[in-house]
Amino acid sequence: MIIRDVELVKVARTPGDYPPPLKGEVAFVGRSNVGKSSLLNALFNRKIAFVSKTPGKTRSINFYLVNSKYYFVDLPGYGYAKVSKKERMLWKRLVEDYFKNRWSLQMVFLLVDGRIPPQDSDLMMVEWMKSLNIPFTIVLTKMDKVKMSERAKKLEEHRKVFSKYGEYTIIPTSSVTGEGISELLDLISTLLKEN
């Protein structure tokens, strides 16, 4: 997939406040500070998604219109300890509404930090998406920070944990080196063309 143009067209802060569905869309979700905005910028090949050093900055669902016909959707990060219980409930309601009501959603890309074992919040997200029958692919981020001698071990560690929930594609990526970006774009292209 060649991304020719990208535009942030909607910032949704309340359930149902979404743009009309298009031909297809994919969404990206992960723990706060997992590198979601950096990965989106790498996919877009331009800096359009805001990257923050402060975890938990994305408190909305951001819809990026790609090539004037698809949405790439940036979901708010989860698992940030300094967020109040009320904010966590608002996040859950917003994301659950999105998952249940976007018929054009082809795939969710679950971003997981490749440097560390999957966290409890990642596994809860897997269970939640499975319970809602949401198709997802696991994307390991920050792989440039994993030593070459440890990569096979880290990949196997993630495969072993996630295999308890079923068979899932795992794509190692780095927004710094570009690793996995073309593979991810190819998968997205296939998904969107099938729609």
Swiss-Prot record:
Coiled coil: none annotated. Keywords: Cell cycle, Cell division, GTP-binding, Magnesium, Metal-binding, Nucleotide-binding, Septation. Mg(2+) binds at S37, T58. GTP binds at residues 30-37, 56-60, 74-77, 141-144, 173-175. Pfam families: MMR_HSR1. Its cofactor is Mg(2+). Residues 22-194 form the EngB-type G domain. GO terms for biological process: division septum assembly. One of its GO terms (molecular function) is GTP binding. One of its GO terms (cellular component) is cytosol. InterPro entries: G_ENGB_dom, GTP-bd, GTP-bd_ribosome_bio_YsxC, P-loop_NTPase, Small_GTP-bd. CDD domains: YihA_EngB. Belongs to the TRAFAC class TrmE-Era-EngA-EngB-Septin-like GTPase superfamily. EngB GTPase family. Necessary for normal cell division and for the maintenance of normal septation. This is Probable GTP-binding protein EngB. The gene is engB.
